Every structure is written in C-alpha cells, then in structure tokens.
Amino acid sequence: MSEPHGTIRLPARDIPVPSTVSREAQAVMARPPAESVEFPALDDPQAWRAMIAADDGAIAAMMAGRAGAQVTVENRDLAGGGRVCEITPAGLDDGDERVYLDIHGGGELCATMAAGTAIRMAARVWAVDYRMPPDHPFPAALDDCLAAYQALLAERPPERIIIGGASAGGNLTAALILRARDEGLPLPAAAVLMTPAADLTEAGDSHQTNLGLDPLIPGSGKQSFLLYAAGQDLSHPYLSPLNGDFTKGFPPAILTTGTRDMLLSDTVLLHRALRRAGIPAELHVTEAGGHGGFMGMAPEDQEILREVRRFADTHWAAVTERASNPSQ
C-alpha cells in the first residue's frame, strides 16, 4: 500500500530462512534474533559504562583462547592517551615491513579480535585501542587513530600499510584516511571497509528495509551515535565519511556487507561514492548476511575473509613489484 510521498506500508509477513545459504548459515539464522537494545540517556554516563562493560565481557569470553600461542602481543602507549597493540603472528620474518592497521568496532576489544586478523592476514597488526565514549567522545577515537597512523608512518613506508576495520571500525578507517589526507599525510596502500557505519544520520534505505532482519543490530544505533558525536553535526565527513570529498584522494578499497545487514546502504553508498570519484573499489555482498555476516560460523564468512586477504596481498604485492621494477 502506497502512502503520501511514496512511503510504502507493508502488511505483516513472515520472512523464512533462505535455502540459498549454507547449512551453517541457516543454523545461525534460525537462532532467536537479538533483543532490542534500550540505550541509556545521553546524560547518564554511568549507565553507558555499565552497558559497555557488559558487552566487552561477553565478547572477551567468546574470543578467549582463539589465537593462543600463535601470536605475540606488545602494547605501546600513544601520545594523547590511546594505545596500540602490536600483534605479530608466529614465524613472521623480522624484515617483513607489511602492517595492517586494525581499527576495531565499537563493541570489540583491542587484542582479542586483532589476533585473529594477524593470523588470517599473515602480517603484523597494529590494533588501535582508542578512547571511547562516554568519557571520551568525538574526536578522541579519531585522534588516537591518527596518532597511531603517524607513529606507524615513522617506522614504515605508507605503501606497506593497509588500514581496515568493521562497523564502527570501518567508520573510523574511512574517517582516518580522510583526515590524514586533509592534514597532508601520505595515503596507505589500501583500505578494508567491512560493513562500515558510513552515515551516522542513518538516511540509507536498509535502515528501514532491514529493520528486524539483521540478527546483530536489532534497531537504530542513533542514540550511540549521538553519544559519540557529543553535539557535533552527524553529517560531518569525519563522523559520516560517506560525505567526504573522495576526488581529493583515497586509496583502493574493498567493502563487504550482506543483504540483511542494517548497514547495507551505508556500504553500497560508500562504494558508489568511491567509484564516482574514480577510486578503485570492490564491493562484496553476502546472501542473507547480517551485520558481521554469520558471526564467523559459516563458510560464507570464510569466503569474505579470503577475499579480504586476496585484496590485501594484491596491493602489498603491487608495491613489491614496483620496487623490483622501478621502470614500470
């Protein structure tokens, strides 16, 4: 039924688990959906701290022991108050200059997720343990990411650096590259943008069409975005990088999402903005995948991770080839 101004009112209907995904993905989708989150009031920092601590604890328990002795971890303090976890997979050559600057999502922990990234990428990872709201709203997290990139540039050439993140980490990855470029820093070799929160105004179509379908994001995240922005305009490119001017420069990028991802539109729109600016950009969409795919439990998740590894290896290898053949 069509409403004024083109709004469509849909009748209540059942959405089955599709037969077009793996059995493992079907099993994940058959689980009860995440309960709707009731965010605290913006002026109640103690309640926000308690909610964040509970989320962090759940993720730490889920990730415990996944990396084991396959990596070594060294913590580094950054100017301004942030920290970097340098994670090196076992057996990596000491002379290997490749570094993946990993920016975790809003609900993740520094070393737990990044250890898996280091193993999958077979490269050294610098994971930014950035300051977060409610105690440190915007631009603290972005400041810490910039400080990490500056520290990394002091040790590695930019063409050996790839920056990546998922969800809020995808937001910060894109925002960091825009800010670094605006401040005259060299661009990294490439960017990995996995289901990025590219538009904090939630204007994209999927924020309506996938409402109730995404198993990980049960509803709007606007309250947490407002907490992070601390009164700043949500449409600013450093908050909503979709609004950045990509014609001024941006590295090649890979973007990933799924058809049930609440941030499907954020990802698709960001990919289109990059392509309009002439930036090489790949877009990979998983059938029926929600925010974060199938939580790492299905073959579809591994396919996406292999695509990311291929993309990173391609861009790191291109640098090696140019160094070996300077006439090219």
Task: Please identify what each model-predicted range represents.
Residues D96-G106:
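Short beta-strand element of the alpha/beta-hydrolase
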Residues V84, L101, T117, F138-L200, ...:
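Short strand-loop-helix active-site module centered on a catalytic nucleophile
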Residues A298-Q328:
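Catalytic active-site module of serine/aspartate enzymes centered on a nucleophile-bearing elbow/loop
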Residues G289-E300:
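Catalytic histidine-centered segment of alpha/beta-hydrolase-like enzymes
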Residues A111-V128:
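Short amphipathic alpha-helix adjacent to the substrate-entry channel of hydrolases
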Residues M1-L92, T320-Q328:
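A glycine/proline-hinged amphipathic helix-loop "lid/cap" segment
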Residues G249, L255-T257:
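Short beta-strand/loop motif that positions the catalytic acidic residue
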Residues L178-S235:
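Hydrolase active-site cap/lid region
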